[in-house]
C-alpha cells in the first residue's frame, strides 16, 4: 500500500483507522492466524494491517487484528466459523463482503445475498477503495 494512501486514510476526519502495530505484535498475530488454519493471505494485506489496523467509514469496515479498542471486528474471530479453505472475509459493508480468494489470488467484493462476485482486484489498496466506496 502506498504511503500516500495510508496518509489519506489517516488524515481523513471521516475515516476511523486503527493504530499501527509493533512488529512483535504483528508476528504473534500472524502465528495465531496460521494456528487457526485459515487460508493464507498475501503480503500486501499484512503490510497494510501493520500500518492501519482496521478501517471504518460510512457503514463499511475492514477488519482489524485483535484490536484492544474493540472498535474493529477481529479477522480470526470473523472467519473461524466459516469453514472454507479458499476464502477469507476481510471486511464488509451493508451489502457486500470483502474477501480474499486464494484460488483466484484476488481480493473480491461478494454480494452478501446472491454470493456473486461484483468486483475483483489484485491489490488490497484497490479493494479498500471499493469496499469503503472512496
Predicted segment positions?
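Short aromatic-glycine-(Arg/Gly/Cys) micro-motifs in beta-strand/loop hairpins
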Residues: 105-112
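A surface-exposed partner-binding patch
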Residues: 1-99
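Residue-level detector of flexible, active-site-proximal loop/helix-junction positions
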Residues: 94, 114-116
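Compact, glycine/acidic-enriched structural inserts
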Residues: 116-134
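Short helix/loop capping segments that flank catalytic or ligand/cofactor-binding pockets
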Residues: 98-100, 109, 118-119
Amino acid at each position: 500500500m502506498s504511503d500516500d494512501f495510508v496518509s489519506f486514510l489517516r488524515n481523513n476526519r471521516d475515516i476511523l483507522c486503527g493504530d499501527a502495530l509493533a512488529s512483535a505484535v504483528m508476528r504473534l498475530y500472524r502465528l495465531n492466524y496460521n494456528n487457526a488454519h485459515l487460508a493464507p493471505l498475501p503480503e500486501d494485506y499484512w503490510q497494510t494491517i501493520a500500518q492501519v489496523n482496521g478501517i471504518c467509514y460510512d457503514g463499511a469496515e475492514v477488519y482489524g487484528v485483535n484490536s484492544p479498542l474493540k472498535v474493529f471486528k477481529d479477522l480470526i474471530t470473523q472467519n473461524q466459523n466459516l469453514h472454507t479453505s479458499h476464502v477469507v472475509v476481510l471486511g464488509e459493508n451493508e451489502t457486500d463482503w470483502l474477501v480474499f480468494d486464494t484460488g483466484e489470488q484476488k481480493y473480491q467484493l461478494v454480494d452478501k445475498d446472491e454470493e456473486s462476485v461484483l468486483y475483483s482486484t489484485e491489490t488490497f489498496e484497490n479493494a479498500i477503495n471499493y469496499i469503503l466506496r472512496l
